[in-house]
Amino acid sequence: MEIRTFLERALKEDLGHGDLFERVLEKDFKATAFVRAKQEGVFSGEKYALELLEMTGIECVQTIKDKERFKPKDALMEIRGDFSMLLKVERTLLNLLQHSSGIATLTSRFVEALNSHKVRLLDTRKTRPLLRIFEKYSVLNGGASNHRLGLDDALMLKDTHLRHVKDLKSFLTHARKNLPFTAKIEIECESFEEAKNAMNAGADIVMCDNLSVLETKEIAAYRDAHYPFVLLEASGNISLESINAYAKSGVDAISVGALIHQATFIDMHMKMA
């Protein structure tokens, strides 16, 4: 969904048929407002906020940038426009910034806990309907990378696919003839044997799903000895407390759905000058 379309729908959702305050406002006037943080975090949502302000005729006097850290009471944005319009966009603007910054802030905590320049932290497709682009953009601002945006990015075979595949190697040979040349094939594995079979069958990426650190290390050792070109990804209930141990297991990437679905709004408010 285009950013402008997304924002128009978000604003329409809040405005309905119009802000009733306009009916009782005797005279409109120019006003200045500040968006301030009420807790610390990592700023995200700048691109969406600026587009929202532009489409509603509000001037952004000053803003901090995506990926910048902030503290309580910091001024994040200074905006100026018609008093009535500032009030119209207030909740939509805050929702965007709070949600996006919440994801970026939690993601940054996982990046810090990961503590590795070699292992990439990835998000997942566990996103809210119609918010995937927005939420994955927020993950990038927190310092992680995106996994697949959709089913058309790469072929990923999970247990629900594999239970109907009798010969994995033959299936992958068939798949490569029908996929774009650049498309990767990733296979989700829940044991050492499944990971070994996936590598032997020709997978580009093997996901170690819900495996212990020790099991993941064993798979990484086998990969290093026999298929060093295969990428390994760890996934499944990996927390802030366990992510560093998985980073040391020999994998190339770690995917964490919690970056998005466990993130909470960062508290902010907008006040008139």
Curated annotation (Swiss-Prot):
Catalytic activity field:
nicotinate beta-D-ribonucleotide + CO2 + diphosphate = quinolinate + 5-phospho-alpha-D-ribose 1-diphosphate + 2 H(+)
Residue sites binding substrate per the record: 91, 124-126, 148, 158, 188, 209, 235-237, 256-258
> Subunit structure of this entry?
Hexamer formed by 3 homodimers.
**A GO molecular function for this record?**
nicotinate-nucleotide diphosphorylase (carboxylating) activity
Q: Does the keyword DNA damage apply?
A: no
Q: Give the domain of life.
A: Bacteria
Alphabetized CDD domains for the sequence: QPRTase
Enumerate the NCBIfam families for this protein. nadC
EC number(s) reported in the record: 2.4.2.19
Q: Is Transferase one of the keywords?
A: yes
Described purpose of this protein according to its UniProt entry? Involved in the catabolism of quinolinic acid (QA).
What is the name of this protein?
A: Probable nicotinate-nucleotide pyrophosphorylase [carboxylating]
Name its pathway. Answer: Cofactor biosynthesis; NAD(+) biosynthesis; nicotinate D-ribonucleotide from quinolinate: step 1/1
Q: Tell me the keywords, alphabetical order.
A: Glycosyltransferase, Pyridine nucleotide biosynthesis, Transferase
What the entry lists under Pfam families is as follows: QRPTase_C, QRPTase_N
Q: Which residues cross the membrane?
A: none
One annotated GO biological process:
quinolinate catabolic process
**Coiled-coil features, chain-numbered ranges:** none
- Which family is annotated? Belongs to the NadC/ModD family.
Output the InterPro entries linked to this UniProt entry.
Aldolase_TIM, NadC, NadC/ModD, Nicotinate_pribotase-like_C, Quinolinate_PRibosylTase_N_sf, Quinolinate_PRibosylTrfase_C, Quinolinate_PRibosylTrfase_N
Q: What GO terms fall under cellular component here?
A: cytoplasm
